[in-house]
């Protein structure tokens, strides 16, 4: 079969137009290859993905790497298929890029199978509707916004409130406890963080059960817009072909939208609200609908979602909200109090915070904790203007308990040991429920509030109080 080749007619940044012979246009999403000497010495080293048919036998493509060094008239090869990701157990412990090439300098992947990165979501009849909670070992999450196995979880937060640290702690806790395979997609984040994560995983022994797919901040928008799909293809293989329960971590889903917006502008589409692409909801839907549980296996995804200027109504985070089963909202106000993880206990939600799923006792205590914290929030204006003395005895008690709860929601992390100097804590769900139940019932009203800060279980808080009293 003769190979279908075209030639470059124009290059504008990450967008390359290619002309083919009449009747030989490659399909949308097909991968084309061209040699770019500026990247390295190998042949056909640059992948272009067909995005539009322009008419007059031309296609407009998005480059997956640098286009510096391309010339007009250069020959372009149509591969006749989409970008494909290597799948299977050979990808575990490796770092690959958007086009499935290893970037960890450890030789070829050696996989037997590869899957296209654009696929249909599983049909309704194949999807599973079973709902069960799974424990993360992080108190504030397990108590107030529990995660569902096979669900989609979003970690929302502005710059520097701890999304990546929380996602690294979840990888550490869940991958250790869960013991299954994980896939991590680094979408448009810092290269340094990617390196830190790799080192961290190597040290904790989680690496051999994880496939890492990276497309960092310095990559062209085409790579950042597609790297999440490459990771998803790997996770889908474990779910569909091997019948496993997989964890998919994406850091950061906002960068997927941001890259889509850059690509959209380069393709000449008219922007919609706040300058985002007109296809924002469609692109997000195509990605999110593939992350689901089937009768074969499940994909549980944890996605960090950057919130521009701390505005949750921005179209990018607002579009992601609609797809999620649980949201963990990180708050700058809580981070300023020095309470980490800086999860907002009143803003975070979960679809499975339901007595029929998590049990009556857990549900009742979670609601009591939220009631006390909400009441404290309502009283804060009065305290700020008139002071604590003007409150009734009942309100003073609520404030004291709320401050203890607030501090008890903090917890030392394993991945932050190097910064905090205190060893990380994994708290079992029963211990979390017991601890908050005792605070809410007033059993520890006599203890100082600082005893509850940065501890694991309630027993540790009592122990810390005894130490403070002895000083």
Swiss-Prot record:
> Where's it found, cell-wise?
Cell inner membrane
Cellular component, GO annotation: plasma membrane; proton-transporting ATP synthase complex
Q: Which reaction does it catalyse?
A: ATP + H2O + 4 H(+)(in) = ADP + phosphate + 5 H(+)(out)
Annotated SUPFAM superfamilies = C-terminal domain of alpha and beta subunits of F1 ATP synthase, N-terminal domain of alpha and beta subunits of F1 ATP synthase, P-loop containing nucleoside triphosphate hydrolases
Which Enzyme Commission numbers does its entry carry? 7.1.2.2
How does the record classify its membrane topology?
Peripheral membrane protein
- Major place of localization? membrane
Q: Which residues bind ATP per the record?
A: 157-164
List the keywords (alphabetical): ATP synthesis, ATP-binding, Cell inner membrane, Cell membrane, CF(1), Hydrogen ion transport, Ion transport, Membrane, Nucleotide-binding, Translocase, Transport
Give a GO molecular function annotation for the protein. ATP hydrolysis activity
The family assignment reads:
Belongs to the ATPase alpha/beta chains family.
Subunit-level organization: F-type ATPases have 2 components, CF(1) - the catalytic core - and CF(0) - the membrane proton channel. CF(1) has five subunits: alpha(3), beta(3), gamma(1), delta(1), epsilon(1). CF(0) has three main subunits: a(1), b(2) and c(9-12). The alpha and beta chains form an alternating ring which encloses part of the gamma chain. CF(1) is attached to CF(0) by a central stalk formed by the gamma and epsilon chains, while a peripheral stalk is formed by the delta and b chains.
Q: What does this protein do?
A: Produces ATP from ADP in the presence of a proton gradient across the membrane. The catalytic sites are hosted primarily by the beta subunits.
What is the name of this protein? ATP synthase subunit beta 2
**Organism encoding this protein:** Pelobacter propionicus (strain DSM 2379 / NBRC 103807 / OttBd1)
